Amino acid sequence: MEPGKRRTKDDTWKADDLRKHLWAIQSGGSKEERKHREKKLRKESEMDLPEHKEPRCRDPDQDARSRDRVAEVHTAKESPRGERDRDRQRERRRDAKDREKEKLKEKHREAEKSHSRGKDREKEKDRRARKEELRQTVAHHNLLGQETRDRQLLERAERKGRSVSKVRSEEKDEDSERGDEDRERRYRERKLQYGDSKDNPLKYWLYKEEGERRHRKPREPDRDNKHREKSSTREKREKYSKEKSNSFSDKGEERHKEKRHKEGFHFDDERHQSNVDRKEKSAKDEPRKRESQNGEHRNRGASSKRDGTSSQHAENLVRNHGKDKDSRRKHGHEEGSSVWWKLDQRPGGEETVEIEKEETDLENARADAYTASCEDDFEDYEDDFEVCDGDDDESSNEPESREKLEELPLAQKKEIQEIQRAINAENERIGELSLKLFQKRGRTEFEKEPRTDTNSSPSRASVCGIFVDFASASHRQKSRTQALKQKMRSTKLLRLIDLDFSFTFSLLDLPPVNEYDMYIRNFGKKNTKQAYVQCNEDNVERDIQTEEIETREVWTQHPGESTVVSGGSEQRDTSDAVVMPKIDTPRLCSFLRAACQVMAVLLEEDRLAAEPSWNLRAQDRALYFSDSSSQLNTSLPFLQNRKVSSLHTSRVQRQMVVSVHDLPEKSFVPLLDSKYVLCVWDIWQPSGPQKVLICESQVTCCCLSPLKAFLLFAGTAHGSVVVWDLREDSRLHYSVTLSDGFWTFRTATFSTDGILTSVNHRSPLQAVEPISTSVHKKQSFVLSPFSTQEEMSGLSFHIASLDESGVLNVWVVVELPKADIAGSISDLGLMPGGRVKLVHSALIQLGDSLSHKGNEFWGTTQTLNVKFLPSDPNHFIIGTDMGLISHGTRQDLRVAPKLFKPQQHGIRPVKVNVIDFSPFGEPIFLAGCSDGSIRLHQLSSAFPLLQWDSSTDSHAVTGLQWSPTRPAVFLVQDDTSNIYIWDLLQSDLGPVAKQQVSPNRLVAMAAVGEPEKAGGSFLALVLARASGSIDIQHLKRRWAAPEVDECNRLRLLLQEALWPEGKLHK
């Protein structure tokens, strides 16, 4: 190729001319048929523009002149100077013709548009004819022998190598063509960079670079038309090529050669006609192209771009073939079998580009071993690909290139034209060589190929004698596409998959030998024998001395419905199931409660031992009949300046004491100054109260629940009954932070104040007493709606409240199943979140039975206290201010005696201040009166068994209580702060001990004790003083420990006292 000369579409065969020529050869054998076809082609060519008539009138001697020029090229080695001058002259003449041709094109461009519509219809007919011609040519090419094709291949390749050498030498001699040499160097650099192998041929990289360049410079509007025409005709050509490829195998080689000489006549005419048609059709399809540009151009343009980048590369590879003929022949057999089907994919001017692409596919496979020796022979064909792509932008650049040629000297123009003619001759020889190679291997490969669908099996068509293996190209493209998809998928997966190196471990952990092993290794075998005394002798590792613990995963079910209440991975028979031991939950709770109490007491003793001043102050207050004493911590901020009004104990929890404190004399805490305070103490923990209760009304009396001391009942001066539930969460009540800590002040859970006005008390309450189910009798005459078990559990029982007017109300204590934090609408006295309330059960009027007929002078009798018989809670006794004790029942049954009277006859204004039943089940009780007399009554007798009138020196008795540890001992308190101890077995005439409590006056007294204690019984007196302090006096053992058979001895004493009384009354 001449330096500086850009290769155009005029330098190659046009696909339309080639198809028509092949059709003439294949369909007609006689001269008449050929003449008829030539006339038809002449008529079609006459319709073209005038500038194309000259190449249409080429005579058959043109092929001979082409061969002469090739021969001149071969002889150029001997005389390069003379041949160069002649070539330059020829090139000048050809340039003059080309300029005239360009001028005629500009003049008749408007005339082309008028004829384009009729040509489109003729072009469609020509395409159909070409389809048949190509399919018939496939069979004709199979007739060529393999030996003839190989021989011609080698000869034409050698001639082409010599002509290429001549052209290369001419290019190097011309200084004006430095631009072409620069392109050649760039092409070699790309080849060295990308390489040329079977997996990645050079045409792939050229296609890739060309695609990037084309994205930067958008195509002309007619490119989409070419893609649509190509894709629409592809399937039809593949179908016909497959059906008729085997039907023309009887044609001879001579007919093919004759047709090859006639191919050049119609080449230029059809190329110009296709250009005109393409321009006209692009103008019509311009709107439609814009809509489908983003879709069809991406899908269909990829294959056309991929195939259009390697036509010139095939020519260079053939020119540099000459080192190993056998290897080249081997590549020719492998790649020359299937190259026919892709010609019809490009209409018009692009079909010539596809011819060059097919040549590239054939020659790339043959030149893998010779790319290293062919580096200097390559040119930069990127610009050539632009020209040969059939785009209209190249036609606009042709005048510029021709103007540059006109500026060159005449000698250089001639030389360029001569090189161009040599290249045309080379193209013809390459076509003949490719046809021969295809005919040798085409039939065998065609028979081996499976006849599948048109989308999978490649169709073949002849393209100027140059063949491309599109089957392998398609396979490579699919492989590359699949590899690209796999690479993209692997890249995405690698982003998601991340190895975690946060955990490391050692595969080999070889710690150093410890001292013991080193000692045994050195000295253990000397006169010793190593023996193991533990099990698992084979394991000698450190810290391993016993067998491994067996573990098993199980699931559990609570409560268990059967003996099998758990399961795991192992399957066992139900007979092997171990019977779950039955746990006594109440016993466990009792043990835990006692254990907690013991621990708390021990901690309290340790605290007291650490404070010797506290112990010394308590020992100073010890009485002579007590072994030791202690003091409750009443110096708390909320208890300062408050006097103790009364003390109460629990018969169930003997160590529990309740103290009632009046209003403070001085203001200290504004929140508590207007409220009465009740403290629940444990005598073994004197550092502070267990619970602190507050009440707005004055508390006149109180008591604890009979069986479980978790409820506290109190009577007020306003006549209401108040209940505190000691189990409630402290978050429901007031909490105050004082100087010594954080304290919770509990308000009443339930109060009868303001509700139940029809049955509520209208006078101050004098006593509140619990009514529990008898533990000494199996049956009770009380008609209770609750079962015995429920009543014994402490969750439901009765209490009685007595006011000074003689009204006795009986209440049922009810515990709700669920607390309502929002409060109750029906129970207005219930605190929000509370669960315990009182329900009125019965009302007993005692005023009528206590009134004395004929003694109106004394007025209404006032009731002071009430007690229920422990052995039979149906019976109760009530003390009055007339010295009489009333006896009654809750069922309004007649009882005898109705009144308990003193030994003196007549009615006296003496108050019965205190009444107490014996805690040991005997039907006897003590009564202390305001005149200082103490009476011992039996429930079946109206008069006392024993009565002591001057035992307290006529001082009023304010406190009286049986000893909880000894049946024959009781304690008495008078209003002069004296304490008396009575022991009936020792003396029934008076007290056996007396103690004056001074200087701090005694206000209240209560006795606590536990006779069943394992370490021995203890008896303690809780003394409340006027200053507000509370002392605990632990009495000596002689008063606390019971004597032998003390209950029987007491009965004998009472019987002896009863006989004289009976005789006296008789």
Curated annotation (Swiss-Prot):
Expressed in chondrocytes (at protein level). Residues 351-362, 381-397 have a biased composition (Acidic residues). The keyword RNA-binding does not apply. Residues 473-552 are annotated as: Binding to the DYNLT2B-DYNLT1/DYNLT3 dimer. One of its GO terms (biological process) is embryonic skeletal system morphogenesis. One of its GO terms (cellular component) is ciliary tip. It is found in: Cell projection, Cilium; Cytoplasm, Cytoskeleton, Microtubule organizing center, Centrosome. Keywords: Cell projection, Ciliopathy, Cilium, Cilium biogenesis/degradation, Cytoplasm, Cytoskeleton, Disease variant, Phosphoprotein, Repeat, WD repeat. Residues 22-366, 381-408 are annotated as: Disordered. Residues 30-135, 147-171, 180-256, 264-308, 316-336, 399-408 have a biased composition (Basic and acidic residues). WD repeats lie at residues 694-734, 775-821, 907-947, 952-992. One of its GO terms (molecular function) is dynein light chain binding. The modification Phosphoserine is found at residues 30, 247. Belongs to the dynein light intermediate chain family. Acts as one of several non-catalytic accessory components of the cytoplasmic dynein 2 complex (dynein-2 complex), a motor protein complex that drives the movement of cargos along microtubules within cilia and flagella in concert with the intraflagellar transport (IFT) system. DYNC2I1 plays a major role in retrograde ciliary protein trafficking in cilia and flagella. Also requires to maintain a functional transition zone. It is linked to Short-rib thoracic dysplasia 8 with or without polydactyly: A form of short-rib thoracic dysplasia, a group of autosomal recessive ciliopathies that are characterized by a constricted thoracic cage, short ribs, shortened tubular bones, and a 'trident' appearance of the acetabular roof. Polydactyly is variably present. Non-skeletal involvement can include cleft lip/palate as well as anomalies of major organs such as the brain, eye, heart, kidneys, liver, pancreas, intestines, and genitalia. Intermediate chain of the cytoplasmic dynein complex 2, a multisubunit complex, composed at least of eleven different proteins. The cytoplasmic dynein 2 complex consists of two catalytic heavy chains (HCs) and a number of non-catalytic subunits presented by intermediate chains (ICs), light intermediate chains (LICs) and light chains (LCs). This is Cytoplasmic dynein 2 intermediate chain 1.
